[in-house]
């Protein structure tokens, strides 16, 4: 009995670790996407608050998706809807970039309302979760384990998104890299729903996302570089 109980506990622990690892790996591209959504908000306080409220709603939607996962996977239309939503976000971002307002300074943030961003966060996370939730359900049939992994995944996502919000201000190409990542996830989701055998393996998608992130972090903002330089000069003068 003791050995049986110990074996069951080890099995549960390993399954939970697998779910947490799965959620963590799948959170990186999701996090940078959510960070890009809140970046237009005018203050860091509003950005953090929008992430908090948006992910609370997202957690509710994730749980609803988990509870109905066996039903949802029967309908490819859900994946198509999620894919089209992600592709719409990307198209909207680059369309606005191609049509700047002459009266708006080139580096200024577009106006977005706090309550407009929250549903965008929730539905974007839901679209990203369509793939990961079905994978998590395949790992184990213990619902409480999947829910625990889901909760840990949202906490991890919140932490990573907070980091990316700061990095989006520091690195010039990171926002475009974020939306190109959303584009790749949207295409994968669309292909999986329409023609699953043509979808590339996960490692190729991961490699592409890694390349996009590398490009995104390749150039720092000129303003931040100049600020760093001016902060170093007085220290050097003092040492001299």
Language-model features: locations:
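Multi-pass alpha-helical transmembrane bundle typical of ion/small-solute transporters
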Residues: 1-240
